[in-house]
Amino acid sequence: MAHKKGGGSTRNGRDSASKRLGIKKFGGEHVLAGNILVRQRGTQHNPGKNVGLGKDHTLYALLEGTVLFKKGTKGKSYVSVEPAKDN
C-alpha cells in the first residue's frame, strides 16, 4: 500500500476582483455636478433632491452643493444634494 497521497489537482485558486462599491461622498462633503455619491447593486440608497440614478443604480450629483443623507418612510435611505449658497 502507498503511504503517501497521490498528487492530484486542486479545485481552488480563483477569486473575483472587488467591484469597489459603497459610499464615495459622505454627508457634509462638498460635491460638483456629476460627482459619484454612491456605487451600489440595487437601491440600498435612493435618489433624493438634486441626485440622479444611473442604469447600474449609481447615485450622482446633478448640481454643486453639499451631500445630505436622510432616512425616509419605512427606513429607506435617501441621498440629496443641498445647492451651494452662490447658485
Curated annotation (Swiss-Prot):
Gene3D superfamilies: 2.40.50.100
One Gene Ontology biological process: translation
Cross-referenced InterPro entries: Ribosomal_bL27, Ribosomal_bL27_CS
Region (Disordered): 1-21
Keyword Cell membrane: no
Keyword Calcium: no
One of the record's GO cellular component terms: cytosolic large ribosomal subunit
GO molecular function, one term: structural constituent of ribosome
Record's keyword terms, sorted: Ribonucleoprotein, Ribosomal protein
Pfam families to which the protein is assigned, alphabetical: Ribosomal_L27
PANTHER family reported for this sequence: LARGE RIBOSOMAL SUBUNIT PROTEIN BL27M, RIBOSOMAL PROTEIN L27
Similarity comment: Belongs to the bacterial ribosomal protein bL27 family.
Name listed for the protein in its UniProt record: Large ribosomal subunit protein bL27
Origin species: Amoebophilus asiaticus (strain 5a2)
Organism classification: Bacteria, Pseudomonadati, Bacteroidota, Cytophagia, Cytophagales
Gene: rpmA
